[in-house]
Amino acid sequence: MAVPARRTSKAKKAKRRTHYKLTIKGLNACSNCGEMKKSHHVCPACGHYDGKDVMSKEA
């Protein structure tokens, strides 16, 4: 059975893992306020969806 000839260094291990990252998918800017929101969801900041006021934010 094959055995590694040398121990993998921390730098080598870190360089190999540079592509193991999470990507944030489905984020768009709100057309009303410009804040980032999930696609096909109501904007949590202003309450707009598809150009319409769905949830009115009252103080």
Swiss-Prot record:
Name of the featured protein: Large ribosomal subunit protein bL32C
GO CC field: large ribosomal subunit
Family indicated by similarity: Belongs to the bacterial ribosomal protein bL32 family.
GO biological process: translation
Keywords in alphabetical order: Ribonucleoprotein, Ribosomal protein
GO molecular function, one term: structural constituent of ribosome
Designated gene of the protein: rpmF3
